[in-house]
Amino acid sequence: MPEQLSVAEFLAVTAEDLSSPAGAAAFAAKMPRCRGAALAREEALEGDQAILQRIKKAVRAIHSSGLGHVETEEHYREAVEALGNSHLSQNSHELSTGFLNLAVFTREVAALFKNLVQNLNNIVSFPLDSLMKGHLRDGRHDSKKHLEKAWKDYESKVAKLEKERDRARFPGGSHGVMSQDTQRERRVFQLHMCEYLVKAGESQVKQGPDFLQSLIKFFHAQHNFFQDGWKAAQSLSPFIDKLAASVHGLRQAQEEELHKLTQLRDSLRGMLHLESREDHPNRKNSGGGYSIHQHQGNKQFGTEKVGFLYKKSDGIRRVWQKRKCGVKYGCLTISHSMINRPPVKLPLLTCQVRPNPEEKRCFDLVTHNRTYHFHAEDEQECEAWVSVLQNSKDEALSNAFHGEPSGGQWSWGTRLDTEPHDLTNMLVAEVKSRPGNDRCCDCGAADPTWLSTNLGVLTCIQCSGVHRELGVRFSRIQSLTLDLLGPSELLLALNIGNSHFNEVMEAHLPSHGSPKPSAESDMSSRRNYIVAKYVEHKFARHSTPDPQKLRTAICSRDLLSVLEAFANGQDFGQLLPGPDGQAPGELALHLAIRVASHASLPIVDFLIQNGGHLDAKAADGNTALHCAALHGQLDCLKLLLRGRAPVGAVNDAGETALDIARNRQHKECEELLEQAQAGTLAFPLHMDYHWGHSMEHGFDSEEEEEEEKHCPSKPPAQACWGSVRLDISNKTYETVATPGPATTQSQSEDSPPPLPIKNSSRTIVLGRAGHCSGDRSDLPSLRSESPEALENRSSPASSSSSLTSSVEPGGLSQAPSSPEEGLQESASISRPGLASGTTSAEVYLPVKFSSESTRSYRRGGRSLEDSPSARQPLCSRRHIPVGLVEGDGSKIGVLPDSLQLLHD
């Protein structure tokens, strides 16, 4: 594009062309620049027109929304004014005055804003409208068209003259002759150029200075708006300052009233709760006390059902398999196709029943680890199963809330499923029987059922809520009745308890004016006390944290001293001093694992759950998991894995705990770590700990006994309870206790399993043998005899039907000190002592019986003389103590002389 020509240059060139013929040539040369200037100016004007159109739309939107804002603000003012009048009618003069004055201020500001919006419309919007409409009527486009036509005429004339000159064969013409011939065309072009520049100039004035002047006027309107609004706000500012102070006082007064009302409400709720429990004691099994927002079953189907369902397999093929199912005592049992496999037992409290809306004959049972898909014969059968499952679940839930055990719940089904539950139930009962555990650890409420697993204390439901607010860093709350606890989670509760815990944590509790809440205290006082006790350790037995004392407590297995160190703020992540005051050696948890035994497992558990730093490394880079694998501490390893210790951590040598277990050939630790690393570790884990309880399992039939004996999948009862320090002999022939460690022996044909219990009222009696002649006075004798047996001994019928043994009362005597003193005895087996007047020849080894012989003396019908044992030389047939070996060979019982042992 040629260079543009300004208006001043156009005026100068045109004046020169008009004044002298010489200027014609100069103007002719600049005519293209004149045309380019006109085109550029037109393009700029068109761009400005588009921008002004956008401004016009924005101004209209502001005006419209401004009017809407003014209207909405007027509604707001009316509402505030109505609120002020309402408070005025309630004699709340301070509040009403504030609302009314702010309503007046809102009205003033709204009026100012409305005026501003109107000024925007008048000052800006109207000029824009006239400008846009004048753009269509100013004739600028016509002038531009005429200019273009004049330019074309001029070019046509010049081209025509050049052709004529070429036709006349003139080598060239002078510029003067050419200028004279095109003079008219130049004048027409100059005229239209002037007209266009005039029209374009007028448009530029309107779009530029005139519109800017309008914006300046609107600026003054805005300035006045803000100035008037500032004046209105300044006039109201002193009143607002006074109002803020009075409102603060009113708020404090109302908060005090609300606090008192809240306390009254809590006390009334507690009273109503107690009354409801007293007035409705028989609503235990109704299920109406708890509304579960799930599918509700039809109550007419009951809570028990046995039948067949089709279950979709969980394998690759996923086929429907017919399985016998039963619902009873809040559990669903699913039998396998193989009879010798125990059925699957699912507690319904942790399941959810979901009917299939698409297929009416199907329903799902969602458990914690998988979803079971069931298919019934028809829709009615499906509805019955769903209703029974939901009803049984509701019944179990209601029983759990009312503290009732599910009758027969753990006795129905297979022994394999019931043993962990039996152990947990016994341990829970033992925890509740510990000193102080019959009352809440914090408020003293009766029958607490909520356990802090990391502290080993029992609390009521109100205090447990505050414990949950503290977080798991301070207290990990679980229910003894609602949650499925494992034995390891009761470890600290069995070894600490409320009494011992409060001896440390409430040692400095004031006796007068004590802040300790009661069972009737509100939640605020409970919260303040529990925070002071568990977070601040305000009432604990204070002493200076001493790492040496902590080391001594761990080595001496003193759990309460470790608890006292915890109360004093001892950092368990601090390196403990070495023995005899040497340089710092290892961490507290590492030391506890290294010296761990059955008696010190509670200390390890306490350190793990209360800041034991599971990922902390010792000087050699080993974590606590490495240390447990290094020393083969299987139970410590289980506690660490339960506490989510990092399995993949490596030490300075680049070894994981699994590598160490493999190198040390600790097979059990290796298997456990492999399961943890693969993510297949199942909780809870069995702990080989001296729980202090023993169990004797009976059998309902001989077939069940044989199955238990030969089934490799079922661990023997003694293997599960091998850590119990008190051996209990066969309860059929009175209970005889033998001290010493229990030995685990395999079941064999020569050692039948224990016999069923026939008299549960008999208790353990520890006796001491009387001194007798010879060198047999040091043999232990543990015998007991019920009064009924003594009374009925003279009766022939009683001698043939009842099974008794005579044991003299007394304590335990010491074992033989040398082999020359008597017969050799195996570990954990004590033999009967000599009665007064019995010679050494009358003492015999315990007799082992095969399973066939055991059944023989049950049936009866053969005499003792037919057996091989009867052919042994006996001095006397009466009052001879005979030993009976238990099923695993580790326990014996003493049989009465009246018992006729029949042997094939």
UniProtKB/Swiss-Prot annotation:
Residue ranges covered by zinc fingers (C4-type): 440-463
List UniProt keywords, sorted A-Z.
Answer: ANK repeat, Coiled coil, Cytoplasm, Metal-binding, Repeat, Zinc, Zinc-finger
Q: Please give the biological process terms from Gene Ontology that the record holds.
A: cell migration; positive regulation of GTPase activity; regulation of stress fiber assembly
Q: Where is the composition biased (Low complexity)?
A: 794-806
Q: Which GO terms describe its molecular function?
A: GTPase activator activity; zinc ion binding
| Major location (coarse) | cytoplasm
Gene Ontology CC annotation, any one: ruffle
Q: Name one Pfam family in it.
A: Ank_2
**Per the record, which residues fall in region Disordered?**
275-297, 697-716, 735-877
- Identify the domain of life: Eukaryota
The record ties this protein, via Gene3D superfamilies, to: 1.25.40.950, Ankyrin repeat-containing domain, Arf GTPase activating protein, Arfaptin homology (AH) domain/BAR domain, Pleckstrin-homology domain (PH domain)/Phosphotyrosine-binding domain (PTB)
Coiled-coil portions: 142-169, 249-273
**Polar residues composition-biased segments:** 735-750
ANK repeat windows: 584-616, 620-649
CDD domains attached to this UniProt entry: ArfGap_ASAP3 (cd17900), BAR_ASAP3 (cd07640), PH_ASAP (cd13251)
Question: Which SMART domains is this protein grouped with?
Answer: ANK, ArfGap, PH
* The Arf-GAP domain, residue ranges: 425-550
Q: Ranges for the PH domain?
A: 302-394
Provide the protein's localization. Cytoplasm
| Reported function | Promotes cell proliferation.
Q: What is this protein called?
A: Arf-GAP with SH3 domain, ANK repeat and PH domain-containing protein 3
Protein's organism? Mus musculus (Mouse)
Task: Report which gene this protein is encoded by.
Answer: Asap3
